[in-house]
Regions:
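Cytosolic juxtamembrane N-terminal segments of multi-pass membrane proteins
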Residues: 1-9, 77-84
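Long, highly hydrophobic alpha-helical transmembrane signal-anchor segments
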Residues: 6-45, 96-107, 113
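Hydrophobic alpha-helical membrane-embedded segments
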Residues: 31-63, 131-134
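Membrane-water interface of transmembrane alpha-helices
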Residues: 53-74, 140-143
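Short membrane-interface loop/juxtamembrane segments of multi-pass integral membrane proteins
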Residues: 69-97
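Multi-pass alpha-helical transmembrane bundles in non-GPCR membrane proteins
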Residues: 89-127
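Glycine-rich, aromatic-bearing surface loops/beta-hairpins
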Residues: 116-158
Length: 158
């Protein structure tokens, strides 16, 4: 998804970040509901996917970007803009580990849903959210490092 300058600014609203966190377990429940309501599960699943897609555009500009959630989004913006040009080893190793952990947790989550295993699904959902939080925390760290040497990035803080 490509976001404009304005869309990135709106996505940095903490409400955007926290509602995405809250939406993920709801998405899992929507997919899981296939075991209960059959193909009607596509309705809540599509609604959740739609919400996650439009989420970056739903909220107003944040009153301040001096918070963890906003800095996580700004860090992701830096990471996507700079790619591997600037990614210190301390971050690259962790990002690679997070990719492996995320794939393992996603596979476990899918398996849990397919097998109708409530415990595996719940644990995998929690693990996905923990992994996302760890990734976001790294984005905050990356942003905090880059903001010191880049005036454009500093202008994103208010």
């Amino acid at each position: 998804m490509i976001l404009s300058e304005q869309s990135w600014a709106r996505h940095a609203n903490p409400w955007s970040v926290w509602t995405r966190y809250a939406a993920f377990p709801l998405l899992v429940i929507a997919v899981w509901s296939y075991h209960v309501i059959g193909w009607w599960a596509l309705v809540p699943t599509a609604a959740m996917v739609g919400f996650l897609y439009v989420n970056p555009w739903l909220f107003a500009l944040p009153r301040s970007t001096q918070n963890w959630a906003s800095k996580a989004v700004l860090g992701e913006r830096v990471w996507l803009a700079e790619g591997k040009r600037y990614l210190p080893d301390q971050h690259a190793r962790v990002f690679h580990a997070l990719v492996v952990l995320s794939l393992a947790n996603a596979a476990a989550l899918v398996w849990g849903i397919v097998q109708s295993d409530v415990v595996l699904t719940a644990i995998s959902t929690i693990n996905v959210l923990v992994g996302k939080s760890w990734f976001n925390d790294r984005m905050v760290w990356l942003f905090s490092e880059r903001v010191r040497s880049n005036p454009e990035y500093r202008s994103w803080l208010y």
